[in-house]
Amino acid sequence: MSIRLSINALYAAVMARRKQPPKDLTGIRQRGGTYQIRVSAGYDPVTGRQLMLSDSADTEDAAVLIRDRLREQVRDNTTARTNVTLGYLLDEWLSGHQVEETTRDSYRLLINGFIRPALGNTPLAQLCRQGPRPFEQLYAELRTCRRRCHGRAFVEHRTPRPHTCDERCAGHVCKPLAVSSVRQCHAVLSGALSAAKRWGWITLNPLDAAQRPRMPAPQPDPPSAEEAAKIANAAWEQDADWGTFVWLTFVTGARRGELVGLAWEHADLVSGLLTIRRSLVRRNGTTILKDTKTHQMRVIKLDQDTIMILSQHRERAEQRCADLDTTLDDDTFVFSYAPDHRRHCDPDAITHRYAKMAADLGIDTHLHALRHYSATELLAGGVDLRTVAGRLGHAGGGATTLKVYAAWLAGADTKAADLIASRLPRPPSVRGERS
């Protein structure tokens, strides 16, 4: 009886095995004690080579599960479609990105200085699998140390070229990268990865879920009225041309490059109008003239004192040209080191000269703070936000001005409140108190 049951059980087991379909082991092969898995993910649009997803497992059943998961990723388009690196993508994106050359140079500095050393050799496929984590980690490291030293001690040499070390070659001290620069790194990466998605190189942008560093609230620090008076007096004492430049910076709030690039044809001393239509910037060691920061010209009305100061400045320039038996043409620069005013001033030299003058006065400030001074004085004086934004050259109809100088609007609001109240009859209960 027991023998008959054993034969029946064996027969049932054999028949059950025959009814089971053979296991699909496509893409799986056994090598030694492990199973290797390879799944085709199409062809690389950049190199034209076939893309393969690979993995390994210790058992056949685990290999089948992994193979099916890789197939699902290919089917759902959640894998990168190219094996190129992030560095290659950044180069391709930057070469065709439509921006001004000065902006392109700043992007290139960010890429070569901070992004490429950290993630440049990482394949896009790996970054897509890891999601936003590598990028957020990079941002955190840069906010701790711009050199990403990870606590490693080393000497920061004064130049990468062969040299003899002196006191300028000192031990590394961690300096965080500014939040604005880290946010620019994020913008560069986001732009490049968005382009990769448009080009079909990747199907998901890992930065879509990344959290970029928060921008701290602007903290403009203009000089006080007393400090401004000291600065203006010191500039006039040095020489009249330098005093004119500092004065014009005070009253117009123009950017450094805008004043350095100013030509006489832009200064209408009869109508008292100053036209800002270009800016002088430094690029690759040379200076070039370009559009203003917002790519918009603006016209600033000048007061009578400023018209007189600029007229005297022009008379001095005309006299210098007369000494050279030439005339002062309208296309020459308003501020120049050359007697004929054909050569502009060095913007960096102006910044250094101003910094030294302020330091000699014991004032901790910088040239751009004069722009803040102009804005805050206008707002505190009750000038409307749109007018201030127009004089400063802020885009957005005053949104930027409001964001930067919000703290100074309280004074203007107080004056507005007093103005309205002064034009209304007071109730009898307070007439006597304020009489």
Residues covered by each model-derived region:
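Basic, Lys/Arg- and aromatic-enriched nucleic-acid-binding interface segment
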Residues: 149-187, 198, 202-262, 270, ...
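Short, basic (Lys/Arg/His-rich) helix/loop patches that form interaction surfaces
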Residues: 148, 233-243, 252, 300, ...
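Short, polar N-cap/turn motifs at the start of nucleic acid-interacting alpha helices
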Residues: 266-273, 364, 383-406
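C-terminal secondary-structure termini that scaffold catalytic or DNA-interacting sites
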Residues: 1-18, 79, 233, 237, ...
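Active-site/catalytic core of tyrosine-dependent DNA strand-transfer enzymes
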Residues: 109, 152, 157, 162-168, ...
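N-terminal DNA-binding module of tyrosine recombinases/phage integrases
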Residues: 29-137, 313-336, 340, 410, ...
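Short, Arg/Lys-rich segments that mark the N-terminal edge of DNA/RNA- and chromatin-recognition modules
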Residues: 1-56, 105, 155, 271-273, ...
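Short, Lys/Arg-enriched alpha-helical recognition elements, typified by the DNA-recognition helix
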Residues: 66, 80-197, 209-211, 331-334, ...
